[in-house]
Amino acid sequence: MEISWGRALWRNFLGQSPDWYKLALIIFLIVNPLIFLISPFVAGWLLVAEFIFTLAMALKCYPLLPGGLLAIEAVFIGMTSAEHVREEVAANLEVLLLLMFMVAGIYFMKQLLLFIFTRLLLSIRSKMLLSLSFCVAAAFLSAFLDALTVVAVVISVAVGFYGIYHRVASSRTEDTDLQDDSHIDKHYKVVLEQFRGFLRSLMMHAGVGTALGGVMTMVGEPQNLIIAKAAGWHFGDFFLRMSPVTVPVLICGLLTCLLVEKLRWFGYGETLPEKVREVLQQFDDQSRHQRTRQDKIRLIVQAIIGVWLVTALALHLAEVGLIGLSVIILATSLTGVTDEHAIGKAFTESLPFTALLTVFFSVVAVIIDQQLFSPIIQFVLQASEHAQLSLFYIFNGLLSSISDNVFVGTIYINEAKAAMESGAITLKQYELLAVAINTGTNLPSVATPNGQAAFLFLLTSALAPLIRLSYGRMVWMALPYTLVLTLVGLLCVEFTLAPVTEWFMQMGWIATL
């Protein structure tokens, strides 16, 4: 019997999301206008809490949908205006261009990145050295490329290798269901479990590597670009400004990588089984023999484009998004990708998040119009200048570990800039606060998948169920990194940021605008 109209509408609303989640959102949409009539300030904070809830529940439903409904209602009932939302979007156009074009541009360099990580995996036998190499490679790439893309490439490598061994273990040439272990005998299952543990640890090292590298440059994370623009910094300025905090954090993060592998803590330390290595090596040898001259030229061209990308960013030859567009044009032209649909695939990864970012800016507009963060900022600004840095870092860190970095970074840098423009803080203090905000937004956020977009991408990927990587296991494996990165970052903000920045100024390496 066909279901009723009401039941059909309920099923269509937010699709496969659980009923309790749908009900919660409906309650939010009913309650918000009523609270707004009584107290706009309370309603504003309620909206922020609801929006953070949708981000935290990203696995139940992509936040664009519920967050977008909340944002539309906020504009409709007068919490902010459509014009203010447009102004926020216009002010952050560079970030939208970064997400649209840079992420798509790197898509056309995936063959080179796959080649790099495959070589690393098969060339280095020491697990400690391999883990360190993955972490360093991910950090370096994330300093210039989008972290999501770097993680996507590592996922591609891992899924490919897992599939190769799974086919051998199941004795089937066509193994379409990688989650089906029923055809694998007991001996192979033991080896497969070890291989899963090995891949889990590598994926986590690579994921943390993207955070370590992403915090260092203005293109490493979308919020970095927002903060750099607000402070008026270019690529080199940003790197030097962050280095009093980010360089010690990078060193300690890499030492943590070695330590957890050596001591086999928190689920790390599993090595690549020799049987798996033999299978993968045979496959790689076969692939290399089949590689044509045309394939080799593609890799060389992509490497040259990579050099252009790094050079253009370092010398600030154009806006970041436009450099990304140049990468798309060069990579497609010189590697023979001419079909519109083939080019279109490059944009599927970035455009949903670009749309979500526009919704973020709607909520930011509400925060500004309702002056929601004014009490917090006033509390922080009442502290001494030295204490302000640590307080900004801590407040950013707490919110970033459960919410999205771009959202948090945008809110706090806007508030700090408003304080500077009103004369509450000096320009010099504002620049130090920008460093505290950026590092506070990026470093503690490795605590949960909600904080790091790259982690959330990994958790929701096809690889996660194959290697038994759940939300809880990811939080557990990230814990040593969370503690080290957060505490070292806080100590550096407290003790090294101001004196080292002062020394840089005396040396003439950086200047206050």
From Swiss-Prot:
Function: Na(+)/H(+) antiporter that extrudes sodium in exchange for external protons. Catalyzes the exchange of 3 H(+) per 2 Na(+). Can also transport lithium. Essential for regulation of intracellular pH under alkaline conditions. Is necessary for growth on Na(+)/symport substrates such as glutamate and proline under conditions in which nhaA is not expressed, such as acidic pH and low Na(+) concentration.
GO molecular function per UniProt: sodium:proton antiporter activity
Cellular compartments per GO CC: plasma membrane
An annotated GO BP: response to lithium ion
Compartment annotation: Cell inner membrane
Record text on activity regulation: Activity is weakly pH-dependent.
Family that this chain belongs to: Belongs to the NhaB Na(+)/H(+) (TC 2.A.34) antiporter family.
Bilayer disposition of the protein: Multi-pass membrane protein
Keywords: Antiport, Cell inner membrane, Cell membrane, Ion transport, Membrane, Sodium, Sodium transport, Transmembrane, Transmembrane helix, Transport
Consequence of gene disruption: At pH 6 and at low Na(+) concentrations, deletion mutant grows slower than the wild type and its Na(+) dependent transport of glutamate and proline is markedly inhibited. However, when grown on these substrates at higher pH (7.5), mutant does not show any specific phenotype. A mutant devoid of both nhaA and nhaB is extremely sensitive to Na(+) and Li(+) at all pH values, and membranes prepared from this strain show no Na(+)/H(+) antiporter activity.
Protein name: Na(+)/H(+) antiporter NhaB
Catalytic activity: 2 Na(+)(in) + 3 H(+)(out) = 2 Na(+)(out) + 3 H(+)(in)
Additional information: NhaB seems crucial when the level of NhaA activity is growth limiting, when nhaA is not sufficiently induced, and/or when NhaA is not activated.
Entries under InterPro entries matching the protein: Na+/H+_antiporter_NhaB
